[in-house]
Regions:
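Metal-centered catalytic cores of metalloenzymes
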Residues: 2, 28-83, 87-178
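Bacterial N-terminal signal peptides that target proteins for export
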Residues: 2-18
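Bacterial N-terminal signal peptides
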Residues: 15-27
């Protein structure tokens, strides 16, 4: 009769445990990177395209509290009236700049060129609109992970948008404290 050999599990348990631990730690940075997003903004991404020298960058980061910090920088942009995160079909999901809002008791309407910081702040669940109204910032981030949303910057000369860009996952984002 043949003897069966049993696999000596006890002997390999430490090796298996360390391997599982290492593999799980490798996946954590990949998940963490999904909390950072970026969009490169230009008139070429608009539909129809807009002939402009204006450009911009929008950076987003999911903060530990579950809210989303953002910063939008632009160059050669004149008379900005608003900026939104929108679905590809144009439905607005969150406002990230509104020149007609009252700030410190007065209406702020930018004049001249914007060369640098246009807007920075934090998006909370209560800021979401359209199909995301009543949902969470995580729902917005899930759309960003799928390249399903844009940042659109509207100006007095191009009320439907002068520059825009698709928001995509990134290795770097924006942290409110910076």
């Amino acid at each position: 009769m043949k003897r069966s050999r049993k696999f000596p599990i006890g002997r390999y348990t430490p090796v298996i445990s360390v391997t599982i631990l290492v593999l799980s730690l490798i996946s954590i940075p990949a998940f963490a990177q999904q909390t950072n997003f970026i969009a490169s903004l230009s008139g070429q991404v608009m539909s129809p395209t807009v002939s402009t020298t204006a450009t911009g960058t929008a950076k987003f980061n999911i903060e530990p509290d579950g809210n989303m910090a953002y910063q939008i920088d632009t160059r050669n942009l004149y008379g900005v009236i608003g900026a939104h995160i929108s679905l590809k079909n144009g439905t607005d999901l969150a406002q990230v700049f509104n020149s007609y809002m009252e700030i410190n008791g007065k209406s702020e309407i930018p004049t001249g060129e914007v060369n640098g910081l246009l807007s920075k702040g934090v998006i909370t669940s209560s800021d979401l609109s359209g199909p995301l109204a009543g949902k969470t910032v995580t729902d917005l981030a899930n759309l960003m992970k799928n390249d399903s949303v844009y940042v659109v910057v509207r100006t007095q000369g191009h009320e439907n948008g002068e520059i825009q860009g698709v928001i995509t996952p990134s290795n770097t984002g924006y942290t409110q404290g910076l």
